[in-house]
Structures are given as C-alpha cells and as structure tokens.
Amino acid sequence: MNSDKLVAIGKIAGTYGYAGWLKVIPLTDFPERFYKLDKVILNQGGKLGTFLVDGLKAHNNFYLFKFSGIDTVEVAQGFQNGILQIDESELYPLPEGYFYHFQLQGLSVYDEEKGLLGELTDIIETGANDVYVVDSPQYGEILIPAIKDVILAVKLEEKRMEIKLLPGLIED
C-alpha cells in the first residue's frame, strides 16, 4: 500500500457506545462520500490497515463508523486520533480549474516578472477566496489571493503554479 497516494477524508475523534463504533470528524468537502464507502484505510501513526465499513450514521457534526473487526470499545480506543484515508483514484472529480488542497501544496510558484518566488506551503480558507501561503527565500512569507486575476496557470504535472503578482504584495 503506497501511502503517497492516500488522501485523508476523516479523523477519528473518539469512540461511541460499547460496540466499537468510532466518531469521525470529516476532513472532506464531500462527506456524502462516506455513504458510498465499502472500505477505508485507517492510518494509526503510520501503521495502515484496510477495514470494511459495516455501518454508518450521521450524528451531530460527526459521522459514526462501524468497521469489521472493531467490535468493542476497548479495541476502538486503539484507533483514537487515527486518520481515515482513501486512494487518490477514489477522489471525486472536480470541475476544470479546481484542485484539491493537497494537490497545490508543494508547488513551485512563479511570477511572470520575478520568476521563482518559492513553494506553496499552506492554504488559508477565507469567506471570499482562498489565500495561498508561499514560503520565499527572497521575500519571506507571501500571501497570494487565489483569484483569476492572479493565478494564471496550475500545472500539476510540472509541480508549478504561474501567477501575476498584484502591486504591493511584496516589497521590491
């Protein structure tokens, strides 16, 4: 199992009841995907295991999962803070021009005039648009608004993002 091709979709927040149910916080914009899962990969501190989904219920802001082989609260407690993952091939397709955050993190960011700025290290979700955090050896931390006027191209195969800096975003 190649963990480089796995994507986190939930985090285990605790147990529920005595029969081995696990409380999961969704880490996806598509929690409805949970109802279509037959199996998931549980990552507990780097140790991976595949588990069949025996039951699922929505509960407040959580989802309650019942997995094959996890039948008691004692066994379930061993998965506290574990991560539910799926293979990258199982991701929902996004419209053209949209990307999952994990696909953008680590891209080299190039300005059309200044050349290489640095690496996209984080994404801040705001109400209006995302903001990309670029770690630049030359300019320090640069905050780039994820808007069409700024983002010119995203080339995942080349691990490259091309942008047009707005005036005032960095000091010359």
Swiss-Prot record:
SUPFAM superfamilies, per the entry: PRC-barrel domain, Translation proteins
Gene Ontology biological-process annotations: ribosomal small subunit biogenesis; rRNA processing
GO annotation, cellular component aspect: cytoplasm; ribosome
GO molecular function: ribosome binding
Role summary: An accessory protein needed during the final step in the assembly of 30S ribosomal subunit, possibly for assembly of the head region. Essential for efficient processing of 16S rRNA. May be needed both before and after RbfA during the maturation of 16S rRNA. It has affinity for free ribosomal 30S subunits but not for 70S ribosomes.
Entry text on domains: The PRC barrel domain binds ribosomal protein uS19.
Subunit (UniProt): Binds ribosomal protein uS19.
Protein name from the UniProt record: Ribosome maturation factor RimM
Species of the source: Syntrophomonas wolfei subsp. wolfei (strain DSM 2245B / Goettingen)
